[in-house]
From Swiss-Prot:
Keywords: Activator, DNA-binding, Heme, Iron, Metal-binding, Nitrogen fixation, Transcription, Transcription regulation. This is CO-responsive transcriptional regulator RcoM. It comes from Rhodospirillum rubrum (strain ATCC 11170 / ATH 1.1.1 / DSM 467 / LMG 4362 / NCIMB 8255 / S1). Its cofactor is heme. CDD domains: PAS. Residues 1-64 form the PAS domain. Heme binds at H52. One of its GO terms (molecular function) is phosphorelay response regulator activity. InterPro entries: LytR-like, LytTR_DNA-bd_dom, PAS, PAS-like_dom_sf. It holds the Pfam family LytTR. PANTHER family: STAGE 0 SPORULATION PROTEIN A HOMOLOG, TRANSCRIPTIONAL REGULATOR-RELATED. The gene is rcoM. The keyword Acyltransferase does not apply.
Amino acid sequence: MDDFAYNLRRAETGVLLLADDLTVTAVSPGALSLLGLDKPGALLGRPILDLHPPPLRPKVAVLLKTARGPSGPAATAVLSLRGGPVLIRASALTGQGETAFALVLTAVGESRETKEGPSARPAPPGYLRKVPLGLGETTEFVDTAGVIYLEADGHYSRVHTAFGHSFCPLALAELERRLDPDQFLRVHRSYIVALAHVRAFRKRESGGLLVMDTGAGDLVPIGRAQVTRLRGLLAI
């Protein structure tokens, strides 16, 4: 078997079904993975164009328009999605139900597992791998692995690392949404911590305190609503 056929057989594939108004009516587990999503609720009932960033929407619209054409050919395009480059093949459907399109998604290119080996554990698709620092003409970055905790700073935030703290132009709510929830947890309305950098837990009457792995052993408060969840994650 040649390399192309071998890679094609191993490539991750998924399927999306769309109604005539281009809302998603069904999704396969493979499609969720390729789109960098965990649950179908994030897709079902939503217009397919709204699920893509603005620069990609015209390309998706042309893809569907071509598939809907008089000759009804399957239309193809390669898009860079959160899970990586994906070949999308769109076909118009005819039937009694509400489904009007089938989109077949196939991962293209070498997988990270192939490049780095099966033991590598990449960050889930769509999550930040670096956090931006500073404001102005130059933006620097810190790897998420180096982030110890994040603190709200008005409409922005402050990133704490082993080397001190720096301004981040992203709001804490956006960071919560874009960081891997297996690695980061919002423990208080003003704080997100990297679970790998929690040094100790201190009880107190209301909530608790986390001792973080900084030189000074910074203390981060825990909101009462997060105490039970945090105890489970830290096995305490």
